[in-house]
Design a protein with these regions (language model features):
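Sec-dependent N-terminal signal peptides
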Residues: 4-12
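Sec/Tat signal peptide C-region and signal peptidase I cleavage site
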Residues: 16-20
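Auxiliary tRNA-acceptor-end handling modules of aminoacyl-tRNA synthetases
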Residues: 21-301, 319, 328, 334-387, ...
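Stable alpha-helical elements in mature extracytoplasmic
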Residues: 305-312, 413, 417, 421, ...
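Sec-exported extracytoplasmic/periplasmic mature domains
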Residues: 314-325, 426-427, 431, 467, ...
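The catalytic-center signature of Zn2+-dependent metalloproteases
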Residues: 333-353, 415-472
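Extended catalytic-interface subdomain
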Residues: 361, 366, 372-380, 421-429, ...
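Conserved catalytic/binding loops enriched for acidic/polar residues
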Residues: 438-802
Length: 802
C-alpha cells in the first residue's frame, strides 16, 4: 500500500510540469493563415506567399477550355513577334478524390452519346493527363457553389508541353533547356469567360544560335501569354465542308450506330452569326447579328495607316449583306482601358509587328467541335509595304504614274494596305485562297476599260491576282480596274458559309440546301468557281496569274516589262544610293518575268479540275489539250530558249553584276526544271492516253528540237544557250537514272539519245561551240554508262556538267 502511494505521488509530480507546459501552450493566441481575397473570374485567382492558386468551380469540371499561348515580347532577330501564336490546345479539369487533374482533349472523334458505340469510342480515346495537383482547400461562393483551390505555380513556371513552344520553333530560335531559376510568372488576370497567365521564360541557347541575345549571354528570354477560354456550353451547329467552296476546316472521325463505315468529317470554320430579328431575316430584310464581329487595331500601328486597315476590315460588310446581315463586321481602335489586354483571347486584333519580313497573315482559332471561330490575331509586318511597293511598281508602273517613284504617297500606299487588310481578314473569316478566281476573266476583258472597272480583274480578293499587269498604257484604266476588290466569289462564299437557316433542323438538312444552292450558283457563272490553293498543277488555278490564257496574258505582261526595265533607274533614283534600290527593283522585274514563264509552263502536263456532286454531270479532271501544250512549249521557246536579251541589254545592268546573264539564269533553270522533271514527263505520258493527248515521244522530240536547234543551224552557241542545253542533259539523265521505274524513264532515255545523235552530226566553225558539244556528249556517255539507279541509292554522280 505504501509502495503504491509513493509510485502514485511520483507520477503526479512528473505530470505536473507537463500539465503546466500544456496550459501555457494553450494560453498562446491561435494563429490562422490569412490569404488575400481571390479575384473573381473564369477561375478565381489567389496569390499568397509567392504562390498562385486557381479556385476551380465545380460547374467547370469537364468543361472544355481553348488554351492559346502567344508570344508577348521576343528577342531581337527571333523572327517571331508579340501576338503570334506559339501553342493551342483544348484542355479540361477532372476531380478525383482530393486531386485535380488537367487533361488534354484530343478532339479527333465524335459520336452521339445515346448511341451504343459511344462506349466503344470512349474506351479507345483516353485523354492524356498533363498536370495534377492536390486540392488545397474547398470554398463555397455566395450561390452555394463549390470551388476547389489548387496551386498552379508549378503549372506555369515550367516547360509543360501544352503551354510550351513546340520543338520546331525551339529549333528555329536555337534554344534548348528551360531555366526555371531564370523564369517566373509575371501576373495572372482573370475575367468572366477567360483567365490570362503572363510568364517570362528563359532558355539556354544552343551553340550555333543566330539570336544576338543567345550569342552574347548564352540565354534567351521570352515573354508569353497563356489564355484559358471557356468553350461555348451550347456548341454551334456545324456546317459540312464542300470542296466547291473554299473554307478552312476542323476534322474528326464520326462514329454512329447507323453507319457501315467510319466517316471522316470536315466542318468549316466560321463565326457564329445569328440574326437579332429572325422574322425580319426570314422576310429577306438585312438584319444585324446578335454579336458583331469586331477587330481591334493594335495601338502600335502608325496612325496614318489605321484608317486603311479599318476600311479593309469593314469592306467585308458588302459580302455579309449577301448572307442577309448588315453591320456584321467592324474595326475599332484599341480602347484606353487598363483592364484589356492585346493577348486576351476574347478579342480579335490586327497586331502590328516591328519586322523586316515583307508579309502579313490572317490566322484564327476555332472550336474543334464545330469550327466556330473564337478569335483571331492578324499578323501585320511593318515591312509589308516594301512588298506592296515592289508588286505595284512592277505590275502597274506602266499604267499608274503614282507607281513611278521610290516611295509612294500615303494615299496610294494606304489603298494598297487596305487591299491586303481585306485579304487577310478574309482568312480570319474562314476563307482559303482561291487561286482560280482570276481565270474566270477573259484576257481581252482585262484591257476593256469599262468592263474591268465595273467587274474587276479577278472574281475574288482571296486570289493571288495582285494587280492588272495585262492593262496597257493606251487602255487608260483607272485604279478600279487595277486593284483587286471583294468581288463575286467572295460574296457567294460568305453567303454559303454564313447564311442562317432558322428552319433547318440539323447540319445534314443544311448540307442538302447548300448543295442545291451551290449547283445553281456554278451554273450561273464561272466567277463562282473555287480553284483551290494553286498546288495541283491546274493551269487555271495558279498564284500571281491573270486571265484565262497564260500565253496571251504573259505576252501583255512582257510588253509592259520591256517598258519598265528601261525606266527603273529613273523610277527608283535616290541620291547617294549605291545601286541597292536599283538592284532590288531589277530583281523584281526578273522575278515577274519568272512568274510569266511558270504560268505558261504549268500548261505542259497540266490538268484542269472541277469538283462536282453526284447530281452534276461531266468529268472532274480534264488534261490540258495537245494543242494548248504545244502552244505553251512554242511560247517558252520564243521567250526563254531564245534568250530574252532585253532583260540584260540596258547599260545599267552591268552596274549590278559582272556577268549580266547571272541575274536571269534562274528563269531558265525554273522552266527547264519544270519541263524536264520526271513528274512532268510522267504526267505527259499518262495524260496521253486521254483523247487529244500530247504523246510523250512527240513532246520530247519538240523539246529537243527547240533546245538544240543550234546543232542544225551551225550557229555559235551563246552563254545562255549553253546553260540551257547543259541543264536539259543533266535533268534528263537524272530522270532516267535516279527515279524509280515509271513512265518517264523510256522518254528521258529517248531524249538523251536524240541529243546524242544531234551532237554527233553537228557541224560548226566555232571552236567554243565544238568544245561545248564535246562536253555534252561526254556527260551523256557518263550518264548512260551505268545501270539506272533506284531512288535512295547512295550514288550521287550528277552528269550536269555545271
Amino acid at each position: 500500500m505504501k509502495k503504491f502511494f509513493v509510485l502514485a505521488l511520483a507520477a503526479v509530480m512528473m505530470a505536473a510540469p507537463a500539465e503546466a507546459k500544456k496550459k501555457k501552450k494553450n494560453a498562446a493566441p491561435v494563429k490562422t493563415e490569412v490569404r488575400t481575397p481571390a479575384k473573381n473570374g473564369l477561375f478565381n485567382v489567389q496569390f499568397h506567399k509567392d504562390k498562385y492558386y486557381f479556385q476551380i468551380p465545380d460547374s467547370l469540371l469537364g468543361r472544355l477550355l481553348m488554351v492559346n499561348t502567344r508570344f508577348v515580347s521576343t528577342p531581337v532577330d527571333a523572327g517571331v513577334y508579340g501576338g503570334e501564336l506559339a501553342n493551342s490546345q483544348v484542355l479540361y479539369w477532372e476531380k478525383r478524390g482530393k486531386q485535380m487533374y488537367l487533361r488534354a482533349n484530343l478532339y479527333d472523334t465524335r459520336t452521339d452519346s445515346t448511341d451504343a458505340i459511344a462506349l466503344a469510342v470512349k474506351n479507345s480515346t483516353q485523354d492524356p493527363i498533363v498536370f495534377n495537383a492536390k486540392i488545397d482547400s474547398t470554398v463555397t461562393d455566395s450561390t452555394g457553389a463549390k470551388l476547389y483551390s489548387v496551386e498552379v505555380t508549378g503549372l506555369f513556371n515550367s516547360d509543360i508541353d501544352v503551354f510550351a513552344i513546340n520543338s520546331n520553333m525551339k529549333s528555329r530560335l536555337g534554344i534548348a533547356n528551360y531555366k526555371k531559376d531564370l523564369s517566373y510568372i509575371d501576373y495572372i488576370h482573370t475575367f468572366p469567360i477567360n483567365t490570362e497567365v503572363v510568364t517570362v521564360r528563359t532558355f539556354a541557347s544552343k551553340a550555333l544560335t543566330k539570336l544576338p541575345a543567345g550569342q552574347a549571354t548564352g540565354n534567351v528570354t521570352l515573354k508569353m501569354n497563356t489564355s484559358f477560354v471557356l468553350l461555348p456550353k451550347e456548341p454551334m451547329k456545324f456546317r459540312t465542308f464542300d470542296p466547291r467552296v473554299g473554307y478552312f476546316t476542323e476534322e474528326f472521325n464520326e462514329f454512329s450506330d447507323n453507319q457501315q463505315e467510319v466517316t471522316r468529317k470536315k466542318v468549316v470554320t466560321r463565326y457564329r452569326l445569328v440574326p437579332k430579328d429572325i422574322e425580319a431575316y426570314k422576310r429577306g430584310e438585312l438584319v444585324e447579328p446578335v454579336k458583331q464581329i469586331v477587330y481591334y487595331i493594335d495601338p502600335a500601328t502608325p496612325a496614318k495607316w489605321r484608317p486603311y486597315l479599318k476600311a479593309g476590315v469593314e469592306d467585308w460588310n458588302v459580302a455579309f449583306e449577301a448572307a442577309g446581315f448588315k453591320n456584321a463586321i467592324a474595326a475599332k481602335d484599341w480602347p484606353n482601358d487598363s483592364t484589356m489586354s492585346l493577348e486576351d483571347a476574347r478579342y480579335s486584333v490586327i497586331r502590328y509587328l516591328a519586322s523586316d519580313i515583307p508579309n502579313a497573315y490572317g490566322p484564327h482559332c476555332s472550336d474543334p467541335r464545330t469550327g466556330e471561330i473564337l478569335e483571331s490575331h492578324v499578323g501585320w509586318y511593318h515591312n509589308v509595304m516594301q512588298l506592296l511597293h515592289s508588286w505595284y511598281q512592277v505590275q502597274a508602273g506602266c499604267v499608274d504614274k503614282r507607281a513611278q517613284k521610290p516611295e509612294f504617297d500615303d494615299e496610294l500606299m494606304g489603298q494598297l494596305i487596305r487591299f491586303v487588310s481585306s485579304h487577310e481578314i478574309g482568312h480570319t473569316l474562314g476563307l482559303r485562297h482561291n487561286m482560280g478566281a482570276s481565270s474566270a476573266t477573259p484576257v481581252e476583258k482585262l484591257r476593256d476599260k469599262a468592263w474591268v472597272e465595273e467587274h474587276g480583274h479577278t472574281a475574288s480578293i482571296m486570289d493571288y491576282a495582285r494587280f492588272n499587269y495585262v492593262a496597257q498604257p493606251e487602255d487608260n484604266i483607272s485604279e478600279k480596274g487595277i486593284f483587286p476588290r471583294i468581288n463575286d466569289y467572295d460574296k457567294w462564299a460568305i453567303n454559303w458559309g454564313y447564311r442562317y437557316f432558322p428552319d433547318a433542323k440539323d447540319a445534314e438538312e443544311e448540307r442538302l440546301i447548300l448543295n442545291k444552292m451551290t449547283i445553281a450558283k456554278l451554273k450561273e457563272s464561272p466567277r463562282y468557281w473555287f480553284g483551290g490553293e494553286g498546288s495541283d498543277n491546274d493551269p487555271h488555278a495558279q498564284t500571281e496569274d491573270l486571265g484565262d490564257d497564260a500565253m496571251k496574258a504573259s505576252d501583255y505582261g512582257i510588253k509592259n516589262l520591256k517598258r519598265i526595265v528601261k525606266k527603273i533607274p529613273e523610277w527608283n533614283y535616290k541620291e547617294g544610293d549605291m545601286d541597292v534600290q536599283l538592284k532590288f527593283a531589277y530583281k523584281n522585274v526578273v522575278a515577274q518575268m519568272g512568274r510569266y514563264m511558270r504560268h505558261v509552263a504549268t500548261n505542259i502536263s497540266g490538268c484542269y479540275h472541277d469538283f462536282k456532286s453526284a447530281e452534276q454531270d461531266g468529268v472532274v479532271y480534264t488534261p490540258v489539250s495537245r494543242a494548248t501544250q504545244k502552244r505553251a512549249l512554242a511560247w517558252i521557246n520564243a521567250n526563254v530558249f531564245n534568250e530574252p536579251t532585253w532583260l540584260v541589254s540596258e547599260p545599267y545592268v552591268r552596274r549590278l553584276n559582272r556577268v549580266p546573264e547571272n541575274l536571269i539564269f534562274g528563269i531558265a533553270d525554273d522552266v527547264v526544271d519544270k519541263l524536264t522533271s520526271a513528274m512532268t514527263i510522267n504526267l505527259v505520258s499518262k495524260h496521253s492516253y486521254m483523247p487529244d493527248g500530247y504523246k510523250p515521244m512527240e513532246y520530247i522530240t519538240d523539246l529537243v528540237n527547240y533546245v538544240f536547234s543550234s546543232t542544225v543551224s551551225g550557229k555559235k552557241t551563246s552563254l545562255w544557250t549553253k546553260h540551257i542545253q547543259r541543264k536539259v542533259v543533266a535533268n534528263l539523265a537524272k530522270a532516267w537514272r535516279v527515279n524509280m521505274v515509271d513512265e518517264q524513264k523510256p522518254y528521258a532515255l529517248a531524249g538523251l539519245n536524240m541529243i546524242k545523235g544531234r551532237l554527233q552530226k553537228a557541224r560548226t566553225a566555232d571552236a567554243d561551240t565544238r568544245a561545248h558539244y564535246a562536253d555534252l556528249l561526254m556527260q551523256i556517255r557518263i550518264a548512260l554508262s551505268g545501270m539506272p539507279q533506284m531512288s535512295g541509292s547512295s550514288a550521287n554522280s550528277r552528269p550536269d556538267g555545271m
